[in-house]
A protein has these predicted regions:
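Mixed-charge, low-complexity interaction segments
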Residues: 1-200
Length: 201
């Protein structure tokens, strides 16, 4: 049964499934989820040009903490983000690069979980106006008290994912340890060195 036909799952559950269980060969799905939860969504039509900078800066922030943001060896888009962090290109150049390269696959792949399509939180309108259009399902998320938690959950999952691929470990197999005193979660790398991944609060 496709996820969107499962009546027991709420829109919140389905959005979480995208973030938690969606197939990821790069961190773009996390960046897109966070950006959609952060930007002004008064208008349901979001132009890629307006989404580009928040999306790219989320990735730039994570590159500072962990350079491993893709399972492949290289990415021209990630190289541009690194150049921005190193002040080698400006924000406008980062924006234009993101418009060209940043959304090539993530828009199509966002709603795929376990090779099935889940409920759509936006539709692809790039062929008509280089934009996406938020659906009623997205706006239903904003009606819930836990809407603010979704961004934190996306961040936590992103931290876990990037830690796992930097250690060459399947994220599902990563052993996570809870530090009650410091209220954080961490893992041990191959040298038994501690790596904090997220708050446990």
């Amino acid at each position: 049964m496709p996820l969107y036909e499962n009546k027991e799952l709420s829109d919140n559950d389905l959005f979480r499934s995208v973030v938690l269980y969606g197939r990821n060969v790069a961190s773009y799905k996390f960046a897109l989820a966070k950006s959609l939860l952060e930007i002004d969504t008064t208008s349901s039509e979001i132009e890629i040009a307006n989404l580009a900078v928040p999306f790219a800066k989320n990735i730039c922030d994570h590159l500072i903490k962990n350079e491993k943001q893709v399972t492949s060896k290289t990415s021209k888009f990630l190289e541009a983000c690194k150049r921005f962090n190193n002040a080698e290109i400006n924000e406008e150049e980062l924006k234009q690069t993101t418009i060209r390269m940043g959304f090539v696959n993530v828009i199509d792949a966002f709603h795929i979980v376990a090779r099935e399509e889940t409920t759509r939180f936006f539709t692809d309108n790039r062929s008509s106006n280089n934009s996406i259009i938020l659906t009623d399902n997205f706006y239903k998320l904003k009606e819930k008290d836990i809407y603010g938690n979704l961004k934190n959950e996306a961040e936590s999952r992103w931290n876990l994912w990037e830690t796992a691929i930097s250690l060459n470990v399947n994220p599902l197999l990563l052993q996570i340890i809870n530090d009650d005193d410091q209220e954080c979660l961490y893992v041990l790398d191959e040298k038994k060195k501690r790596q904090n991944i997220t708050s446990s609060r």
